[in-house]
Amino acid sequence: MEQFRNIGIIGRLGSVQVLDTVRRLKRFLLDRHLHVILEETIAEVLPGHGLQTSSRKMLGEVCDMVIVVGGDGSLLGAARALARHNVPVLGINRGSLGFLTDIRPDELEVKCAEVLDGHYLVENRFLLQAEVRRHGEAIGQGDALNDVVLHPGKSTRMIEFEIYIDGQFVCSQKADGLIVATPTGSTAYALSAGGPIMHPKLDAIVIVPMYPHTLSGRPIVVDGNSELKIVVSKDMTIYPQVSCDGQNHFTCAPGDTITVSKKPQKLRLIHPLDHNYYEVCRTKLGWGSKLGGGGD
């Protein structure tokens, strides 16, 4: 297994618990004589840290691994910045859910030691890339680990749009919006909209309409290498938005085209050896426990 010597730390701002965990993590890594680099925004709220700092954009170039302290949202932001560097990312959960940041703070030293000793799993999670075009010209571009969402923004009116997959017309829809999600994002917004849960190893994309004005509107799962095109109706009088992971936003105009496809670079997500995807789903989604007398 790959050995890690240069460790980057990213932390969610605005949380005392995150800062406490970052300090613990820093001490633990330094005690192992590792080179620690702080992302510059978290470094600003840790006076006297005495460590090298780096912008998030450059962190992937100087680190063997990056540890994210925060919730799933923190890891989503880190993933978009770090995927192009092919640097592994490990998450310590200081959020409310923790689908992606799966190390609990109370097990920080034990689990991080296992990873640093070479005992870990690596998952390659693909991202989506979205581009908004107007009159043939690109006006916005963003990446997403979870989902690309077309939504009305501040308006409460429905959106009319057409969907094309690999150049073939699929359907027109009138709905509150459309979610295009990766397997990683299938347990996020897409799940709330009635989409299926997809195992992270699947090479597939799910298209989930949001409150479609029809009884036949259902999610569609397509090949992960598909190119999706969403055309906003020219007859619209509102200006909907496109959001990537709920963090990057672009305003669309009637007639705009949104293209969504798989990003070439993938996120290398690290887990401890005892990571179990179904246990995560069972714990986070409140699935029932094993019945007495059930199978092993």
Swiss-Prot record:
Keywords: ATP-binding, Cytoplasm, Kinase, NAD, NADP, Nucleotide-binding, Transferase. GO terms for biological process: NAD metabolic process; NADP biosynthetic process. This is NAD kinase. It comes from the Bacteria. Its cofactor is a divalent metal cation. It catalyses: NAD(+) + ATP = ADP + NADP(+) + H(+). SUPFAM superfamilies: NAD kinase/diacylglycerol kinase-like. It comes from Pseudomonas savastanoi pv. phaseolicola (strain 1448A / Race 6) (Pseudomonas syringae pv. phaseolicola (strain 1448A / Race 6)).
